[in-house]
Each structure stands twice: as C-alpha cells, then as structure tokens.
C-alpha cells in the first residue's frame, strides 16, 4: 500500500486558491526539539524521548528556553529581518528513485491535523485547507499555470485577454470533456459557477471584488437582474466576460479571473442555501472534473477516492487513494516505520528524522506565512463590506507597531527552527520575486524602540505595577486569540505574552486559553468584540494581489481594516495601468510600505517546506506549476509493493 502524508499547515487558504499545503520541516537543537510556532504542527519525539528519558516540558520550561534564545536575555539587542536575501534551500526540489514502476496500488494520504475535517467538498464552498486538500482531487479549475504562476492554455480551457476592450474570452479546449458522472461539460457549467458565487443567497466566502468587477454583477447580486449582463455566452464551449477594469492578476493562477466549474445539471435543481448540506457536497455523490471521485466517507476522519474514468488527462496510475486525518503525535514514528510514502515533515523534529535511510528529502519555499493581526472593525453583511471602527481598542497604529517590535521572530526561527524559519520584512513574501521589496523596512526585534514608541504616544505606567495604562490613564488590557495546535504552540504563545509584558503591555489570552481552530476562525469571522488581536496563518497561493485578503469587500479581511489610501493602492494594483511591469512593482512597493506603517497586520514567520519521500516512490518534486506537473497524485508511480523501511 502506498501511503502519503500531508501536514495540515494552515487553517485557511485564500479565497481563490485551492492547493495542497505542505508544512515546514524544521531542524532544531536538542534542547528545544519540541518547540513549534503558532500555526505549525508539532509531534512529540516518542522514540527519542524514551531513549533519552525526556518528559513533556511544561509551558514555563519552554518559555525559559525561548527567552534564552531571544527573550529577556537579549532585550537590548535588535535583530534584523529587513533586506535579507532569500536563503538557499536545504534540499533539492525533486528526487528520482531506482526501480521499474509497478501497476496500480493503493495510496494512503494522511492529513495531519489536530481536528477532524469539516467535509465541505466543493471548491466554491470550501474555506479551510483540510477540506481543500480533498476537494482538489475530485475537482479541477479550468486553467493550468506555469512555474511563474502564469496561466497557460493547456488545461480544460484557454483564455484570450483584450485589455483595451476589457474582456476575457474563455474557450473549452475540447468538446468531449465530461464530469465524473459521465455528463458533458459545457461552458454553461462555467457560467453557472459564476452565477452561483454572485447569487445573493450564496453561503460561501468567494464573492469578492473579483466577481464584482464583472459588468452587471452588482445588479445580479442585488436581485435587480436575472442574469449577468457582462457574461456573454458565444456558444456551448466559449464565453466572453466583460469587466469594469482589467487586472494584471487575471493572468495568474488563483487570480481575478473566475476559474471554477459547477455541474449545472445537478445544482440547478437544488436551492443554493441547501447546497452545503447536500449529498453532492457532503457525501459520496460529489461530481467533478478532477482525477478522482469519492467512493466512501467516514465523517471527519477519512475519504476513499477511486479514479475518475472520465478525467480529461487519463486514468490515475494508482488504483485507490485513502485520505485520512492523522494525529500529529504519530507522524515521525510512522514515517520511520515505512507506514507512509510521502510526508510533509513536522517542524519540531528534524533531528529525529534527518538521518532516516528509507526516505529522501525535497524542499521548497512555501507560499504562506504566519501573522498577528488586530481586530479593528466588523463586516457589515447588509452593505457587504468591512467597516473600520475608529474607536476600536487597537485603533492606534503606534500601539500596533510597538507590539510588532516586541516579538523576536528571527530568534524563534534561528534557534527553535534552526534557520528554516525566519522573520520577514514584508507582507508580500520573498517567493513573489517580481513584486517583493527586499528593502522594505521590517519590524526588527527592538523592545527598546517598542518602549519608546509607547512612551512617546502616552502609554505609560502610572500606577507602578509595571504595566502601561491608556493615554487617559485608564487600564489597558488587551485580549489575544490564538489557535490550539499542540504543547509547543501553547509554549510559544506564552512566550509572546512574556515578550509583550517585557515592554509593559498587559496582553492576555482571550478566554484564558487557546481555541480549537474551527472555533477560533468562527469567532474571528463573527467579529467577536472581546478579541482585540489574534495570531493566524495564510496559505496565499500564487497571486499576491491583496484585494482578496485586505480589500474593502473581502470577507477574509479579518482585521476589518480599510481606508481610502489602502483602497486606492489596492485599486492601482488591480488596474489596467498595472499591466505595465514597472508600475506594477511601484504599486506593490507602495502597498508593502503602507501595511508596515499602518501595522493592522504583520507577518511573523515564513520558511522552507521539507517533504520526506519513501524510496519506493519513483519520482517526486515540489516545484509549483501544473502545466508540466509530474507529481500530482494521479501521476505518481511506485517501484515496489511495499514501502522501504
């Protein structure tokens, strides 16, 4: 049996990207082997601890270790993230093993997560990375993309842009495509998906500025029109979409060009408000155009997939895929025993598995980041947009900046994660080489600067208890929400609180503890008024356009921070003017500076993803792009019946 294991790195992916999320594998010194950052998975070294006689370290003990590598003991020294070049990866990006591929086999694909999956298996409705990892196997978007993230015309459809005419013409590349139930795929299924997301009763999170940019969408969404005037069907296999403005990100994977298809022959007869609970979304009747289809489901635990005989690229090379949720406590020992063939390895245990002989390792820079953000308003459902509250507790950007300077991300990245994790200077991560600004000022660890900022802004300790009061002398107490992941995460969150206290800020955990991930995001999305700031993580896909995460109408804009200046910059990034490469770079640099200055969110950690590949897997790579992909699940081949041990 072939087994794959994928670490569930982040809880959320951006609104237009459904992708596998490979977690970071981090080496660390012996004394800090069980530490891990706020969203990364942690697995205890069962065998190692038995051998060395180690017990679980308490939160206090972990906090002491963190302080030793970058807490109070270094409070006088600033560490630097700004203008730091992209480091080399620890391993190659691909591996080829000896042997002749066998025919078929069963692939066991484990999603490492502390919580069960929700079971929403529809691209248009899925909103967390666990469901999305499953959904991407049973459905495909229309377009493929190359290693520069740009759309190609090699997928289900091709696209032709007319920038001056403000249109995109989408044409299916064949008249013979079929859904997994054998029914034909036509352009009506593409149009139907656009209409579904634009429907006023749509329950998902993907209705955003990209869809509102289609001519006539506003009237359709409000119910004034029964169709979208800007969606012009040309024939059964092509459509011309008219936009209010052309955006450069239309050319990118996960960008602002709609890419989903929905089987109209199924969902047109089901009220849209009932889709999420239907058997076609929750059960075994799911229909898509991906390489697999669902055979059986154990709710929250596992999904068994079999090949889609109508998949347009041909039959899967394996006979079956079992995708199951796996506890983070067992990953390393199971890989060591040969129980899984491909594993996105946990950050905390590099020393425990780096010398394994039954696997090879490959690396990639992950398109994701950890962050801390501030709750500054609410999402107004009636208006369909984020409303910033000027009187929010965290409305002062100086207070937010001071909090950012108080955290030593490089210390945790270097000492805890042995350099495979690090701080970064920008909300645009370095993997977006074309628009990332290496010279952007970052929030380098500088507690003295944090204290000075707070002093100058009037946040002073007026009663001698070591904690600062508000400018008016009233008590300043800040509630901080974070996800429950593992003991290492709990320890790092406690260290955050110590770093905050070091600069005189009374910041406590919301409810006094971390929250289970689904509850955490439920509270954040509901704009719980008791939450002032929170730590999360984003898998951001291949389009750096900030509109979907920080736009005025973006439901994923969890901080709810909007402003005329920010809207203007986002508008320029998405404008026709930005088709000019120099202008595009200029606008993205403006955005990076603006986010830094306003500090409504700041990145904490970025890093490298390391994957273990069992030596019976013929070939595996970690490079981006689907045009010439060789490592999608349906393409993987095995060279033996049993795993190498």
Language model regions located:
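N-terminal lobe/hinge region of extracytoplasmic solute-binding protein
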Residues: 107-163
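Ligand/substrate-recognition segments at binding pockets and active sites
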Residues: 109, 299, 460-537, 609
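Aromatic- and charge-enriched surface segment that lines or borders ligand/interaction sites
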Residues: 157-206, 392-394
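Surface-exposed binding/hinge segments that line
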Residues: 207-269
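Gly/Pro-rich hinge or "lid" segments in bacterial periplasmic/extracellular proteins
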Residues: 255-313, 320, 447, 452
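Ligand-site clamp/hinge motif
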Residues: 280-283, 307-353, 506, 515
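Detector for C-terminal structural segments
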Residues: 309, 404-436, 488, 492-497, ...
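Append "and occasionally in soluble cytosolic enzymes with long acidic Gly/Pro-rich linkers
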Residues: 393-498
